[in-house]
Amino acid sequence: SNYCNSNCIYCQAQSNQLNSCKMMTKEIAKKSVDFALHSPQKELNFEFQGGEPLSNFEIIKYIVEYTNSVNKEKTIQYSLVSNLSLLTDEMIEFFKKYNVSISTSLDGHELLHNYNRPLSNYPNTYKLLGKTIAKLKENNIPYGAIQTTIKKSLKYPQEIINEYREKGLNNIFIRPLTPLGYALDK
């Protein structure tokens, strides 16, 4: 899906409203899986991203279940890159069952994260992310995070490190700002 419910200040894709978005269909998903399974690679990683991939969770389920039903010889890993704002208990159970690893974004302390990553329908994305990370921990689902650096972030290096430690993250993947879309002036 290219739909996203977030309005990140540095979005390179720029947020799409639901009425202008495109969702992957089962037909395209099946063709994509079949194509990947015919590759010479012995190991594959299917990564779900977007937009916000959880907005099309039914297709994620379809891809994983279809792949597992037809795959006979490849090692398949699944991963998800998401803001996690749409995460439900049903999704957690599914990701746990199929060993889906998860990556999200954590840009720093509460004020910095909320400044960078506002949701269109939720005032405090930092607190919401903290709740979803706690659920992932409770369910032993592997997760990681990416920190997108903007000029404002440079004032808070220790605070960013502290946030990652407090959230149980042992590594910080720092992504510099790419000057595309809304990110041009950040």
Identify the residue ranges that each predicted region occupies.
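Canonical Radical SAM [4Fe-4S] cluster-binding loop centered on the CxxxCxxC motif
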Residues: 1-26
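Radical SAM/AdoMet-radical enzyme domain recognition
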Residues: 21, 29-49, 56-179
